Amino acid sequence: MPLNVSFANRNYDLDYDSVQPYFYCDEEENFYHQQQQSELQPPAPSEDIWKKFELLPTPPLSPSRRSGLCSPSYVAVASFSPRGDDDGGGGSFSSADRLEMVTELLGGDMVNQSFICDPDDETLIKNIIIQDCMWSGFSAAAKLVSEKLASYQAARKDGGSPSPARGHGGCSTSSLYLQDLSAAASECIDPSVVFPYPLNDSSSPKPCASPDSTAFSPSSDSLLSSAESSPRASPEPLALHEETPPTTSSDSEEEQEDEEEIDVVSVEKRQPPAKRSESGSPSAGSHSKPPHSPLVLKRCHVSTHQHNYAAPPSTRKDYPAAKRAKLDSGRVLKQISNNRKCASPRSSDTEENDKRRTHNVLERQRRNELKRSFFALRDQIPELENNEKAPKVVILKKATAYILSVQAEEQKLISEKDVLRKRREQLKLKLEQIRNSCA
């Protein structure tokens, strides 16, 4: 909803109290130049960062967001003369009007926003972006406004003609400058588009610059990279670097220096303390890469006590088959239990090694089971019962021969059983005949 408040309903006392430390109206002679070179001016962004917190005991008030920016009195501020002469029409304003216009200049839209807008449109809400990210933003804006107005007045004085024609030339120059400002106002960014998420959210999208900020993009990239690598970056939300108004070619170098002096601390990013780099200047920080925090993967050592089958046989004491089978089974169970104890996060290589190790353990367990089966078969063969070093082939051959012999003996016993059964039947019949003859 646009703010439609007339210029006459403003509270001058409230506006003057909010910015009183920055103005000295007793000295109207060369006002902007004295304010720029005053000793009481807040420190520039290039100085020590901690001196900026000595600006005021409490944070300054947020800039006024009223429709007075669109008033005709405010439009005439581009041709405002600090000397109070009739060159730019400044003599028609009272001291209160001058104070109000300077207040709106220094505390309004941080210089880079447009000074001219239509009160009937909704562009006033769009071109006002949230201010006061840090205290130093206000002092940087005041210094930049003072330098711009001083350079603009110097350009007007140098390029002027005789007194009647000079006023006309000044009006045309100011109209061109105001036209550029109004063109920039139409391309301002909507705060709802720039800030779709809260500012304290670390995952909020970064603001996109408008087409007017092509000259500012290289320095903004360097400032962003230097702010990410600055050791003094505090864990605060990412602040928006605003754009500067279009200026003439006479003060392009000065504007570039001002852009390089923009406070680096206002662009901040959450960083772990251990990952902060030690770069001290924006030029050195522009070549640095943002620190990454990859997942720390810890390797877990698993002792499996693998047996080397290629090694020569050791001269250890041979245990009995039953005891050796128990030892082998216990060793396999111990290896599996040790393998399951590793529960820390692993990389892909570690997982592959663990899978291979588990496969080897299972394969070894299968071989041990097969070996125990051979040992049991060897114990059943009479010829190899006490032979601990009998090969598997011999065990298989002897077992086959023994099975055949046992089967032959079984057939022999079966035939003998049949003969005995027949003999029994014959004896039963003979006994029955004897009983019948005796009766």
UniProtKB/Swiss-Prot annotation:
One of its GO terms (molecular function) is core promoter sequence-specific DNA binding. The modification N6-acetyllysine is found at K143, K148, K157, K275, K317, K323, K371. GO terms for biological process: cellular response to hypoxia; cellular response to UV; cellular response to xenobiotic stimulus; chromatin remodeling; chromosome organization; DNA damage response; ERK1 and ERK2 cascade; G1/S transition of mitotic cell cycle. Glycans are attached at T58. Gene3D superfamilies: Helix-loop-helix DNA-binding domain (4.10.280.10). The 9aaTAD motif is a transactivation domain present in a large number of yeast and animal transcription factors. The modification Phosphothreonine is found at T58, T315. Residues 209-238, 279-288 have a biased composition (Low complexity). Residues 413-434 are annotated as: Leucine-zipper. Residues 354-406 form the bHLH domain. Residues 201-359 are annotated as: Disordered. The keyword Glycoprotein applies. It comes from Ovis aries. GO terms for cellular component: chromatin; cytoplasm; Myc-Max complex; nuclear body; nucleolus; nucleoplasm; nucleus; RNA polymerase II transcription repressor complex. Residues 266-278, 315-331 have a biased composition (Basic and acidic residues). Pfam families: HLH, Myc-LZ, Myc_N. The modification Phosphoserine is found at S6, S62, S71, S81, S151, S161, S293, S314, S329, S344, S347, S348. This is Myc proto-oncogene protein. Transcription factor that binds DNA in a non-specific manner, yet also specifically recognizes the core sequence 5'-CAC[GA]TG-3'. Activates the transcription of growth-related genes. Binds to the VEGFA promoter, promoting VEGFA production and subsequent sprouting angiogenesis. Regulator of somatic reprogramming, controls self-renewal of embryonic stem cells. Functions with TAF6L to activate target gene expression through RNA polymerase II pause release. It is found in: Nucleus, Nucleoplasm; Nucleus, Nucleolus; Nucleus; Cytoplasm. Residues 251-263 have a biased composition (Acidic residues). The keyword rRNA processing does not apply. Phosphorylated by PRKDC. Phosphorylation at Ser-329 by PIM2 leads to the stabilization of MYC. Phosphorylation at Ser-62 by CDK2 prevents Ras-induced senescence. Phosphorylated at Ser-62 by DYRK2; this primes the protein for subsequent phosphorylation by GSK3B at Thr-58. Phosphorylation at Thr-58 and Ser-62 by GSK3 is required for ubiquitination and degradation by the proteasome. Dephosphorylation at multiple sites by the PNUTS-PP1 complex promotes MYC stability by preventing ubiquitination by the SCF(FBXW7) complex.
